[in-house]
Amino acid sequence: LVGSEMCIRDRYMNEITSMWDSHWLTNMGPKHKELQANLCDYLGVDNIDLLTNGHMALELTLQAMNLQGEVITTPFTFASTTHAIVRNGLTPVFCDIDPDTYCMDASKIEKLITDRTCAIMPVHVYGNVCNIEEIERIAHKYELKVIYDAAHTFGETYKGKGIGSFGDASCFSFHATKVFNSIEGGAVCYKDK
């Protein structure tokens, strides 16, 4: 059996004390800005915003894009992926998965595209990266947005680039069950401000 170990108490208390002493606990305070800058460097991205959780990263990204219609996604994911789509008044259209990677089978996307399709929301699963080149080729061909659910691939790279640098946006979860966690939290990396 392997036990988990909490961070060193004194170090943790120093971090908490410095936040308390600054009188700035949230909303772009010094620790927030420091984490954002460190994550940009670590993930190899230009833009990142921190949010309360991965679900809000997905939901607010879709809302910011002001999309209408259908979003092609996968049913092989946590419910938040589909919930974010539905909560934005969009219709999820499910694409089957590749049996080897458990990621969306890119070869099945085009036959699901209709005149109502506005975006593709692939999910990188269990550290497996989606077929980025094919997904982005299809998105470019049909002028669709691509929002990656990257909750399972924090810190991964693809062809030397951070996984958060692909698509129009990539969303991460920092839930306690994820590779990198802050007990709760999330982030969205994006190209255009």
For each predicted feature, which ranges?
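Short, small-residue-biased leader/transition segments that mark boundaries at the very start
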Residues: 1-8
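Structured loop/turn residues at beta-strand edges in well-structured enzyme cores
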Residues: 2, 43, 66, 115, ...
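Phosphate-binding glycine-rich loop
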Residues: 28-70, 76, 83-88, 94-96, ...
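PLP-dependent aminotransferase-like
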Residues: 63-150, 157
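Conserved active-site segment immediately N-terminal to the catalytic lysine
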Residues: 148-182
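Short beta-strand-to-turn element immediately C-terminal to the catalytic PLP-Schiff-base lysine
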Residues: 172-173, 187-192
